[in-house]
Amino acid sequence: MSRLFVTCYGCWVRYVVLSCFLMFALGKGVAQQRSMRVMEYNVENMFDTLHTAGLSDIDFTPTGSYQWNSQRYWAKLGRLSRVIAAAGGAQPIDLLALVEIENDSVVNDLIHHTKLWRMGYECVVSHSADVRGINVALVYLPYRFRLLSKDSLRVAPQGKTLRPTRDILHVAGELVTGDTLDVYVCHFPSRRGGKQSQNFRESVAQHLRHYVDSVMCMRSQPNVLIMGDFNGYWPESFLTEGLGVQLAATSEAVQPNELYLLTYALKGGADVRGTYKFQGEWNQLDHFVVNGTMLDDNRKGHPYIKSSSCRLFSPMFLLKKERSGEGVRPYRTFLGNYYQGGYSDHLPILLDLYF
């Protein structure tokens, strides 16, 4: 037997073994991907370092009150990429809603110029009339969520005293099951301002419900996911009346086109009881809301949610001990004007969709 034949035969055997291994690994990977992980994260004033004419963003420049320079900017992007990677674990985050980002360039720097670049993420960003330039974004894996349409939905101020607010981002995409998922990313008006801000949140909630109802009438099998910083918690009236949300855990007869809150009374480790801490009290300001169709766990082959699907993400590296030594709080970037060098004043929330 010639040496050439032996060499070729050995190469052929290695090729067959390698091919079989890759086919097995691919098949196993496909079998394991019968779910997708969704994350929502308010990232606390993720601005670039440049002043944009017409926007009140001068504080977040190198000479502004926060001394927001390139070193701090890139350090924060690196920290955020660590959070996103850790939240995905063995299964990367498929859909990521980012709240409190300034513009497209910030999100593109995050997904293309940090450790996340390997994932191949793409993004859609709102373009709001907010005076500070605050926007929201949806980051997605294009092979898991094929973009169908996108729209930055304007919420017109009601009355002369109300200023423009953040747009609602609506993104429709096709899942690996062939189903269409309509995603709404929102950032409701701040709680500052008392009764006036409450009225504004009511107005945004009513606009959002109108947009969602229109889509649910248009789709034959609607799958709706609303997520973001609502700046409010159950059972405030803008949720129960303006948006018409019910609690998923207490709804005996779930209706396909009604909306259900998944993020009531979430608990994390280290006695964490919400996504935001104010004056020593935890508040659940960040939420996931879905339509009733997605609560049907008999929909094998289509997106559905289990009772354990939704949770806080609160690893210790995202937390900092209170000055009193009792309890913890989110490890934020700034405390007032003091630079702490942390991650965000909010904690992320996670949701697993199953097929």
Region spans (language model):
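Metal-dependent phosphoester/phosphodiester hydrolase catalytic core
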Residues: 54, 176-210, 236
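Bacterial Sec-dependent N-terminal signal peptides
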Residues: 1-33
